[in-house]
Amino acid sequence: MFKRFNRGQISFEFSIIVLSILLISTITITYFLTSSFDEGTRTLDKIDLGAKTAVSLVNSGYNGTQTEGTLIYAGMTWDNAGNNYENITVYISNTTPVPVNTRLFVKNYTIESQGIDTTKYDFTIAWSG
């Protein structure tokens, strides 16, 4: 009779220990990730992701934004000034001229979809091709 109770008790204690280890691991990883990347780094990542998505949407003809050629996301550069990121430039290569409304769509989509604070992080798009 006591052996059954002991097995159940050990199983319960083991479950509590595993749960505690998982909880501590999750808290540690979350703390590490939030303290490792500052706001500027996260904003650069958002601009990068937003621009890539906007280029992909234009290439698929999203919302009437069509070009005769293909847009290619070519990368991004920036300057560090202390803890600030300045002169952020996104490079997009195009094979044919891109209409003004499509250019505006790419920039506005990047800003709006990623919630970029343009008073702190303004960026330009350099079109080549």
Curated annotation (Swiss-Prot):
Where the record places motif QXSXEXXXL is 9-19
Q: What happens when the gene is disrupted?
A: Deletion of the gene leads to poorly piliated cells.
The organism sits in which domain of life?
Archaea
Where primarily located?
secreted
**PTM comment text:** The N-terminus is cleaved by the prepilin peptidase EppA, which recognizes the class III signal sequence.
Q: Which residues cross the membrane?
A: none
Q: Which GO terms describe its cellular component?
A: cell surface; extracellular region; membrane
* Propeptide section residues: 1-8
Location within or outside the cell: Secreted; Cell surface; Fimbrium
Which keywords are on file for this protein? Answer: Fimbrium, Secreted
Instruction: Show the Pfam families listed in the entry.
Output: Class_IIIsignal
UniProt function note: Minor component of the type IV-like pili. EpdA is not essential for piliation to occur, although its presence has a positive impact.
Share the domain note from the entry: Contains an amino terminal motif QXSXEXXXL, which is part of a class III signal sequence.
| The protein's name | Minor structural pilin EpdA
Organism of provenance: Methanococcus maripaludis (strain DSM 14266 / JCM 13030 / NBRC 101832 / S2 / LL)
